[in-house]
């Protein structure tokens, strides 16, 4: 039986392994998360594997009916820290091709997992990362179109969802990826939808009303596929307009993301049409205990439930 109720949880930034802690702590973290209600599955990054201890470790330590949304963001950013040309929307042709090869790795990984467990991976979140330092949106759009022409033709066993990150045209870009209007134009003829992440849209305009606008734009284009909720802050441990997945307010007192924001996006989106909704939250304190890490996520789930009560 597949589990189609509940939320997709980006739990990895709360996991002890995110702070290079022991396997014993990691095991206990996933045990407690597995006992948490209202979870449909995980948003999980894939570097070489889906977990620092390997794919099988993750699958062994999480419920069999949990589904997985794979995200390319962590490896994309790791590679960009070494070479700012790495990305699907990069006008550096060599690095664009290197990024396409990384997506080939994801394709093979996902098909292998789904071959052993039908429907386990339900979606891949891809990203339109341009050549860092090149402000030319037309060149980035053209590069992204070339990448999609190749990637979208592979025989995927999951949905493809473009996660919008703050745009290269914003006032102070954190990721600086392709603007939403160019993304929507490029994916128009593909079976690819868009995921709006609350913080990543708010950061783009330094404006908490922008996530709703982006949600409406994607929906109007017939491309809204998912909503993910991460927070951002103006000050405190999570910084100023940083892409650090702050928890909800009031759990995180400085957070700009509230239950009201979830409610307005969900209402605008028509949740029954979405492939998934969920949260991705970070434990900022490397020395935090397991309980605090889990409580961040449980608070997030409770906020989602409160916001979506009809």
Curated annotation (Swiss-Prot):
Pfam family, one: DUF4862
SUPFAM superfamilies: Xylose isomerase-like
Superkingdom assignment: Bacteria
Family that this chain belongs to: Belongs to the YiaX1 family.
Name by which UniProt lists this protein: Uncharacterized protein STM3670
């Amino acid at each position: 039986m597949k589990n189609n109720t509940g939320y997709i949880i980006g739990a990895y930034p709360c996991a002890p392994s995110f702070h290079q802690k022991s396997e014993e702590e990691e095991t206990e973290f996933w045990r407690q998360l597995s006992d948490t209600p209202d979870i449909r599955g995980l948003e999980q990054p894939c570097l070489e594997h889906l977990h620092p201890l390997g794919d099988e470790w993750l699958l062994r330590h999480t419920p069999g009916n949990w589904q997985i949304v794979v995200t390319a963001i962590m490896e994309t950013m790791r590679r960009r820290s070494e070479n700012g040309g790495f990305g699907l929307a990069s006008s550096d042709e060599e690095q664009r091709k290197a990024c396409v090869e990384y997506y080939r790795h994801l394709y093979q990984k996902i098909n292998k997992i789904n071959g052993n467990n039908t429907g386990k991976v339900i979606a891949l979140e891809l990203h339109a990362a341009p050549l860092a330092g090149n402000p030319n949106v037309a060149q980035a759009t053209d590069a992204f179109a070339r990448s999609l022409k190749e990637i979208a033709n592979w025989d995927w066993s999951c949905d493809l969802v473009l996660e919008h990150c703050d745009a290269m045209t914003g006032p102070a870009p954190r990721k600086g990826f392709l603007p939403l209007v160019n993304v929507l134009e490029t994916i128009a003829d593909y079976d690819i939808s868009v995921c709006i992440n609350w913080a990543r849209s708010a950061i783009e305009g330094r404006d908490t009303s922008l996530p709703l606008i982006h949600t409406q734009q994607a929906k109007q284009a017939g491309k809204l596929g998912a909503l993910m909720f991460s927070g951002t802050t103006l000050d405190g441990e999570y910084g100023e307009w940083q892409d650090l997945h702050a928890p909800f307010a009031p759990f995180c007192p400085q957070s700009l993301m509230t239950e009201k924001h979830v409610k307005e996006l969900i209402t605008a989106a028509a949740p029954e049409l979405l492939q998934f909704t969920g949260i991705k939250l970070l434990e900022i304190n490397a020395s935090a205990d397991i309980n605090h890490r889990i409580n961040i996520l449980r608070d997030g789930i409770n906020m989602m439930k409160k916001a979506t009560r009809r």
